[in-house]
């Protein structure tokens, strides 16, 4: 059965919603493994429909939230005759979202794009076609002892990823390796295997709290080695890091995601890492999203460049045993020169580059004549553009403003992720975002860089 057969069987009442979801998840996994990404995306959308239907039926989301999802679902997957609960909601509240019940009883939508970007209508239609007919999927590479023994995977995402992993694991002491893989190319697996394979400490320096949380959750999910998994930590700004520091002191910690500020300003944490270097226990240092260091280090967060001084001290204390990794999907020649000046090793530097152009993005610039005009444009874009969707704003107060405006439009299943978001709430939001519990995020730069979600389809910079 394909995704249409399973979904239609559910609509006909032949199978329950829980049975349909189980079958659809198994199908989605098989489609992903076989590289049929368009069909995989539609299977995931069907699974998300089951979630939204349950959320609506139990009162956890409003009718407007459900209608907004139904609009996207029909444009992505197709028109169907839905259960009475759905058609009644469409008849009552679908009009503001362009959702209606057609003469044949199927739920349909009016195809409409925001006025500000009408000239891009054809491209938006391409997005809703989910790349059908394209052949851009990466070709998998056979697995080996590394992935079989230490992770839940059986194959590598690509031959390039496999080579990158082997280069990283076999890097000599006191060397720096720069690895460039395309977005979605699987750089996170490199840090996970470094931690699992060597049984010493790997420290990953990341630019944002959201990225640290995301990579922490990925590592917990992907690593199968239980000893490594229970000794993975993410530094909690303003939180309790005593267990993590104890893990460093007792030499049980395997993988830590942190920021340069935490290393430089955290007295106990910095001291523990310094001792770990001297004891030869700190073995791998990874700078993730390394391309931001030259700009952020000079103009915004000098700790990124100051950290290079600390790293040099660690190398001396370790007897030049520490290995350094610079990971990114975006590296120009001048950035590479700066990074090797900052983080290069005396014994040698190496590059592994598999850069690739991303074909799918389209950049659209919209004029606005006032704050009110801009707000109206943003609200229209949220309602009409493909989702999942992120709206980036400058500061938390603006994020709250857009939440208020969207609530006035009948939307409640919308959340914010900013510097004001508490740690526990950040963890929950990331988990819900990755699990497709909601489709719209209003965020500042605290969210996003390197956060792994494969189906984000629209980014709006407000």
Predicted feature locations:
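N-terminal accessory nucleic-acid engagement/regulatory domains that precede
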Residues: 1-137, 249
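Glycine-centered small-residue hotspots that permit tight backbone geometry or close packing
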Residues: 118-123, 149-154, 184, 297, ...
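Conserved pre-motif I regulatory segment
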Residues: 130-180
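Helicase motor core with emphasis on the C-terminal RecA-like subdomain
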Residues: 159, 169-178, 182-198, 213-236, ...
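Short acidic donor-binding loop at the edge of a beta-strand
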Residues: 201
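Gly/serine-rich nucleotide phosphate-binding loop at the start of the catalytic core
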Residues: 204
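Conserved Rossmann-like nucleotide-cofactor binding loop
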Residues: 210
